[in-house]
């Protein structure tokens, strides 16, 4: 493979779109980023304009090509990674969306999800899709749009409409409106996809009255989906060859290819994903079963746990309690405090995610005394992020019976050395921090590169996915166990208070 060639990754996130060009050594050559508007038509509703998303993607592609000075024919392939679950329905003839994109965290379809639970479909949907019934996933969003947009049901019945998660919407536009497809990771987040048969599930489609003609073709994560349209890249047809949802792309970018490998992406919340190998593991403890990636004719599965509040707890200390001016200051203040002074912070501002799934519980502080200082509360808040991670990781180990050997980490809060050391101590496991921040985009690039033989195999990719720092446990195991017991008491007390 000529060393003159490159891979482009499109990373379409919840608040911004990015295009990144990588070379053959997995180095970042150029990056462009652009934010786009968020819409909140009613409390709890979150929407995007799909045309604004597409405009932002075209803009970052153009900018990154200008920045890098790379000719289009030198781009060997394009990979796409995306905010998952966000739902677009558009007219296949005009290419125009019939409604805004309903974003993953939007609550406007909660009533549909609650009705499905009341009607007794919880076990059936969990068995088939690996997911819990929730408005988070695409299924209820599709039904809502079909039910609420005038004429949508009639158009859908005639086969005039197309559904896609954001990857599908971008692929359709990027391919000159020729390819309507998605990958197995994104399909597995719709609550319509049977993770055992690897096909759309007719029983669930019938239940929600969703015509199959609406749905994209499902392909492996690493495959040539199609080629760029004539009006992009000066007419050079570049293969679009890799697609994965953002958390799965981060797993792939961190080379977590072995069964039992776990990664944690610390963002506003935190997403912990464990590669469980070639067979799905259904969790008895509130974790989601999902698809990690599809590659070389094989489907790899994963368990996922979401923590609602991670980095946003630090923002709360900064913006809500005015404890410091910059989030980065929290690290030194936590170190200077030396201990939490017996304080535990449960940052359940919007309830608790995995493995508790408790919507009623609210944030709380325990162990306050007259001697409690600002530093104690800051340190306890950072420690809470590590405790929540342990809650999920321990559940994964319990569900799979696989040993925990290390946790690879990326995302903003992973740059906090104090927190990463405490994470290693409380898990009693080494923490490996990614050298590159853009591991999600790198994962999409890896998937695309494999499909066009830019890279040979996963062994080559392991060498390119570099670890920056490793944090080994330094705390006495008994002390770590005692601290964690205190956390479990704090959670139980917060849940008790949240009950009517």
From Swiss-Prot:
Glycerol binds at residues 84-85, 136, 246-247. Its EC number is 2.7.1.30. Pathway: Polyol metabolism; glycerol degradation via glycerol kinase pathway; sn-glycerol 3-phosphate from glycerol: step 1/1. It comes from the Bacteria. The keyword Lyase does not apply. ATP binds at residues 14-16, 268, 311, 315, 412. One of its GO terms (cellular component) is cytosol. The phosphoenolpyruvate-dependent sugar phosphotransferase system (PTS), including enzyme I, and histidine-containing protein (HPr) are required for the phosphorylation, which leads to the activation of the enzyme. CDD domains: ASKHA_NBD_FGGY_GK. Activated by phosphorylation and inhibited by fructose 1,6-bisphosphate (FBP). ADP binds at residues 14, 18, 268, 311, 412, 416. Sn-glycerol 3-phosphate binds at residues 14, 84-85, 136, 246. It holds the Pfam family FGGY_C. It catalyses: glycerol + ATP = sn-glycerol 3-phosphate + ADP + H(+). Keywords: ATP-binding, Glycerol metabolism, Kinase, Nucleotide-binding, Phosphoprotein, Transferase. Gene3D superfamilies: 3.30.420.40. One of its GO terms (molecular function) is glycerol kinase activity. The modification Phosphohistidine is found at residue 232. GO terms for biological process: glycerol catabolic process; glycerol metabolic process; glycerol-3-phosphate metabolic process. Homotetramer and homodimer (in equilibrium). Belongs to the FGGY kinase family. Key enzyme in the regulation of glycerol uptake and metabolism. Catalyzes the phosphorylation of glycerol to yield sn-glycerol 3-phosphate. PANTHER family: GLYCEROL KINASE, SUGAR KINASE. This is Glycerol kinase. It comes from Limosilactobacillus reuteri (strain DSM 20016). The gene is glpK.
């Amino acid at each position: 493979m000529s060393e003159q060639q490159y891979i482009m990754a499109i990373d379409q996130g919840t608040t911004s779109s990015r295009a990144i060009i990588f070379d053959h050594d997995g180095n970042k050559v150029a990056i462009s980023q652009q934010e786009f508007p968020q819409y909140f038509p009613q409390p709890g509703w979150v929407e995007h304009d799909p045309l604004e998303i597409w405009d932002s993607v075209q803009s970052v592609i153009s900018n990154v090509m200008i920045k890098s000075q790379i000719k289009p024919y030198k781009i060997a392939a394009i990979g796409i990674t995306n905010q998952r679950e966000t739902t677009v329905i558009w007219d296949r003839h005009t290419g125009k969306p019939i409604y805004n994109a309903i974003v993953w965290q939007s609550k406007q379809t909660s009533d549909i999800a609650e009705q499905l639970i009341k009607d007794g479909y919880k076990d059936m949907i969990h068995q088939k899709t690996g997911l819990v019934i929730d408005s988070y996933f695409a299924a209820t969003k599709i039904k809502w749009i079909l039910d609420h947009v005038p004429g949508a049901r009639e158009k859908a019945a005639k086969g005039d409409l197309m559904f896609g998660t954001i990857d599908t919407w971008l692929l359709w536009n990027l391919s000159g409106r020729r390819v309507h497809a998605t990958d197995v990771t994104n399909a597995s987040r719709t609550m319509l996809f049977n993770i055992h048969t690897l096909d759309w599930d007719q029983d669930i489609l019938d239940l929600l009255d969703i015509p199959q003609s609406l749905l994209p073709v499902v392909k492996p994560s690493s495959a040539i989906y199609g080629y760029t349209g004539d009006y992009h890249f000066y007419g050079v047809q570049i293969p679009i060859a890799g697609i994965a949802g953002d958390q799965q792309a981060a797993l792939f970018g961190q080379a977590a290819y072995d069964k039992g490998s776990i990664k944690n992406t610390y963002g506003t919340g935190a997403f912990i994903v464990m590669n469980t190998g070639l067979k799905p593991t259904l969790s008895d403890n509130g974790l989601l079963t999902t698809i990690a990636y599809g590659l070389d004719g094989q489907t790899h599965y994963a368990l996922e746990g979401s923590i609602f509040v991670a980095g946003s707890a630090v923002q709360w200390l900064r913006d809500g309690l005015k404890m410091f001016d910059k989030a980065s200051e929290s690290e030194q203040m936590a170190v200077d405090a030396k201990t939490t002074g017996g304080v535990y912070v449960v940052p359940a501002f919007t309830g608790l995610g995995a493995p508790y799934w408790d919507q009623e519980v609210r944030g709380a502080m325990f162990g306050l005394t007259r001697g409690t200082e600002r530093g104690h509360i800051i340190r306890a808040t950072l420690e809470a992020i590590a405790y929540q991670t342990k809650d999920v990781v321990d559940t994964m180990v319990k569900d799979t019976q696989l040993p925990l050997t290390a946790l690879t980490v990326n995302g903003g809060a992973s740059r906090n050395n104090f927190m990463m050391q405490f994470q290693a101590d409380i898990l009693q496991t080494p923490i490996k921090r990614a050298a590159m921040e853009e591991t999600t985009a790198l994962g999409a690039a890896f998937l695309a590169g494999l499909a066009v033989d830019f890279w040979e195999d996963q062994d080559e990719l392991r060498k390119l996915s570099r670890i920056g720092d490793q944090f080994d446990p330094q705390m006495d195991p008994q002390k770590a166990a005692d601290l964690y017991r205190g956390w479990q008491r704090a959670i139980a007390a917060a849940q008790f208070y949240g009950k009517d």
